C-alpha cells in the first residue's frame, strides 16, 4: 500500500521535468514558449524563430504582396486582397506590409453583400419610372412611377421624372398631351385653323343677331296691336240724287248694248240702270 503513492509521486516528477510549466504571465506583446516569454513580431513582420536563452525572437518582413496587421507570431503573412474587375471591383487603397488592400465597387456597381466580395450593376429605371433613391456602394437603385404631369423617356439609374413642358409659358399651344413616358408636344397655332374658326364664329354671331332682331320686331308689332286695335273697314255707299234725272213717267225708248231699239210694252215702266245713265 505504501508503494502506490510513491509511484504516483515519481510519475508526477517525471512529467514535470519533461513538460515544464510556462510562466504564469508575460508582458504585453510577448508570448510564452519553452518556459520563457518571447517577444511577438511587430505588424508587417512574420515569425522565423522563437527566442532562446541567448537570442531574441527572430522576425522577417512580409513581401510586397503580403501583410500582417497586428503583433503576431505567425509563420506566414497574409496575401493582399485582389480586386477582381470581372466582379465589378476596383482598388480604393493599395495594401502595405501592415494593411490589406481596400476594394470598392467600380462606377455603376454596388456590393452584393456586407463583405463586398463582389459587385453587381445598379438597376435601371425604365421609361415611365424615375429614380426615387440613387444607388450607393452597398445599396441598389430605388425606382418610382412618374405621377401625372411628369414623364421619363429613358432607362437610367440616376434620372428622376421630369415635369411636362408648359406650352403656355412659351407662347405656344399644346398639340399633343403628355404621358408618363412622353413630354407634351407644343407648336404654333395653325393659320388655316384660324381662317376656318373666325368665319364660323362670325357667322354664328350674325345668326344670333338676326334671330334677336326678328324676335324684337315681332314683339314690337304685338305690343302695337295691343295698344291700337284695328277697326273694321266698311265700303262707301254711293248715293244718287233723283233730282238729277228726268221724270220717270215720261216714255223713254230703251236701247240695247248694240244700239238696237227696244219697244216698251204698254203699262210697264222704263228701268234704266244707273250705269247707263251715267
Curated annotation (Swiss-Prot):
Keyword Repeat appears in the UniProt entry: yes
GO MF annotation terms: signaling receptor activity; ubiquitin protein ligase binding
Superkingdom of origin organism: Eukaryota
GO cellular component: CD40 receptor complex; external side of plasma membrane; intracellular membrane-bounded organelle
S-S bridge residues: 26-37, 38-51, 41-59, 62-77, 83-103, 105-119, 111-116, 125-143
Topology relative to the membrane: Single-pass type I membrane protein
Topology Extracellular: residue spans: 21-194
Function (record text): Receptor for TNFSF5/CD40LG. Transduces TRAF6- and MAP3K8-mediated signals that activate ERK in macrophages and B cells, leading to induction of immunoglobulin secretion.
Protein name: Tumor necrosis factor receptor superfamily member 5
Organism field: Sus scrofa
Amino acid at each position: 500500500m505504501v508503494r502506490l503513492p510513491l509511484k504516483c509521486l515519481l510519475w508526477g516528477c517525471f512529467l514535470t521535468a519533461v513538460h515544464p510549466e510556462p510562466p504564469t504571465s508575460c508582458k504585453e506583446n510577448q508570448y510564452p514558449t519553452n518556459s520563457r516569454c518571447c517577444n511577438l513580431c511587430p505588424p508587417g513582420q512574420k515569425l522565423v524563430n522563437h527566442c532562446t536563452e541567448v537570442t531574441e525572437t527572430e522576425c522577417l518582413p512580409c513581401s510586397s504582396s503580403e501583410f500582417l496587421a497586428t503583433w503576431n507570431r505567425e509563420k506566414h503573412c497574409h496575401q493582399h486582397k485582389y480586386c477582381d474587375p470581372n466582379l465589378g471591383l476596383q482598388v480604393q487603397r493599395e495594401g502595405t506590409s501592415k494593411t490589406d488592400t481596400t476594394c470598392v465597387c467600380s462606377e455603376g456597381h454596388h456590393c452584393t453583400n456586407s463583405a463586398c466580395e463582389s459587385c453587381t450593376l445598379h438597376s435601371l429605371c425604365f421609361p415611365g419610372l424615375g429614380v426615387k433613391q440613387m444607388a450607393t456602394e452597398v445599396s441598389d437603385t430605388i425606382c418610382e412611377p412618374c405621377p401625372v404631369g411628369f414623364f421619363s423617356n429613358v432607362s437610367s439609374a440616376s434620372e428622376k421624372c421630369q415635369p411636362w413642358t408648359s406650352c403656355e409659358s412659351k407662347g405656344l399651344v399644346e398639340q399633343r398631351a403628355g404621358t408618363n413616358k412622353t413630354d407634351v408636344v407644343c407648336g404654333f397655332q395653325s393659320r388655316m385653323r384660324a381662317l376656318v374658326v373666325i368665319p364660323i364664329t362670325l357667322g354664328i354671331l350674325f345668326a344670333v343677331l338676326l334671330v334677336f332682331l326678328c324676335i324684337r320686331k315681332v314683339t314690337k308689332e304685338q305690343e302695337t296691336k295691343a295698344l291700337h286695335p284695328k277697326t273694321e273697314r266698311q265700303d262707301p255707299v254711293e248715293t244718287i240724287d233723283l233730282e238729277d234725272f228726268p221724270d220717270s213717267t215720261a216714255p223713254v225708248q230703251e236701247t240695247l248694248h248694240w244700239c238696237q231699239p227696244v219697244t216698251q210694252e204698254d203699262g210697264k215702266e222704263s228701268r234704266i240702270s244707273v250705269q247707263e245713265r251715267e
